[in-house]
Amino acid sequence: VGFKAGVKDYRLTYYTPGYKTKDTDILAAFRMTPQPGVPAEEAGAAVAAESSTGTWTTVWTDGXTSLDRYKGRCYDIEPVAGEENQYIAYVAYPLDLFEEGSVTNLFTSIVGNVFGFKALRALRLEDLRIPPAYSKTFIGPPHGIQVERDKLNKYGRPLLGCTIKPKLGLSAKNYGRAVYEYLRGGLDFTKDDENVNSQPFMRWRDRFLFVAEALFKSQAETGEIKGHYLNATAGTCEEMLKRAVFARELGAPIVMHDYLTGGFTANTSLAYYCRDNGLLLHIHRAMHAVIDRQRNHGIHFRVLAKALRMSGGDHIHAGTVVGKLEGEREVTLGFVDLLRDDYIEKDRSRGIYFTQDWVSMPGVHPVASGGIHVWHMPALTEIFGDDSVLQFGGGTLGHPWGNAPGAVANRVALEACVQARNEGRDLAREGNEVXREACK
């Protein structure tokens, strides 16, 4: 008695426009494109239902729990300006739906199933509001921006990096030689490419040994602390941690992980190891464009960036901004702030749908990488500020005099731009002149 089987509209249960969100709710903003004939309210309610407690029909066991306590709620829907049949659906999820400290569970719940739903032509997760009650259950960055600067004894400027090229094919000894040339030229870091793991031409243990030799030799010559992002990504978590242990035993200061291909569970495991053992953790976002490139379907990178800050990483690649449209610049700087700052106000012009309070969670260094060179230095210095890593691959190796002179050119340009900025010069207007003066 009281149970009535059958299919009913999702909006009768999961669309609640009068709902007042709680401080402990996880809030999501979805860009949805309903199928023709599907009302926006039904589509939004379907998203809330299928990513929380709902299924396609009423079930007897609904009566054995409190749906009001556990269900997701679509509490607001707004049309997207300038787009036909696109809406932003706001969904609130009770905190008890999620396992503490697990990005894996968070993503499995919110985006694990609903993206293939028939009522929707397309769906994109634009933003998440993570309440402090949930974010405090995560490890966060193993060390964060300030501790990294203290470890490196480097302040008042962006850090400089370089990816070793060719990314595949070098022997371990030649690879180590390239690392040494860059670091002695003035870079702070060099980097394994994301797809350098342990291939037949260069096994990981050989690479780690020759890179460690290059690190210590360049440190002795320059008097500066140097690092190389030793990619610990592997086919199993056990093998990944074995590589991280070997890096620590060699005295390396930093390791690297491909967090999307490696997975959030592996990434969080590595972050715990890095915090416990004093290793910095560099994160590459390989595979991100598969997820975030389409404007109306997938997951925006700002969500992946927030997830990484919770899962754990001290650096993450975040695009370059340089040469892009102004609107994209603002959106990129929006998620750069979400990586670095403690408190970020809602600002739709920057793509930030919710105010995010990270409380005391350490910040992550954004890494500008990809197609940049020394003449971009003034713009990069102005846009990203000091708390960033500027990574020049071809922009270092492509120097006509070789690797070390390429590194010298980048370091000289960076220090000239920082000094000019500190003297009050306008880098946006005078940047090229600053770099030319530094060439003399």
UniProtKB/Swiss-Prot annotation:
It is found in: Plastid, Chloroplast. The modification N6,N6,N6-trimethyllysine is found at residue 4. RuBisCO catalyzes two reactions: the carboxylation of D-ribulose 1,5-bisphosphate, the primary event in carbon dioxide fixation, as well as the oxidative fragmentation of the pentose substrate in the photorespiration process. Both reactions occur simultaneously and in competition at the same active site. One of its GO terms (biological process) is reductive pentose-phosphate cycle. It comes from Polystichum munitum. Its EC number is 4.1.1.39. Heterohexadecamer of 8 large chains and 8 small chains; disulfide-linked. The disulfide link is formed within the large subunit homodimers. This is Ribulose bisphosphate carboxylase large chain. It catalyses: 2 (2R)-3-phosphoglycerate + 2 H(+) = D-ribulose 1,5-bisphosphate + CO2 + H2O; D-ribulose 1,5-bisphosphate + O2 = 2-phosphoglycolate + (2R)-3-phosphoglycerate + 2 H(+). Its cofactor is Mg(2+). The modification N6-carboxylysine is found at residue 191. Substrate binds at residues 113, 163, 167, 285, 317, 369. Keywords: Calvin cycle, Carbon dioxide fixation, Chloroplast, Disulfide bond, Lyase, Magnesium, Metal-binding, Methylation, Monooxygenase, Oxidoreductase, Photorespiration, Photosynthesis, Plastid.
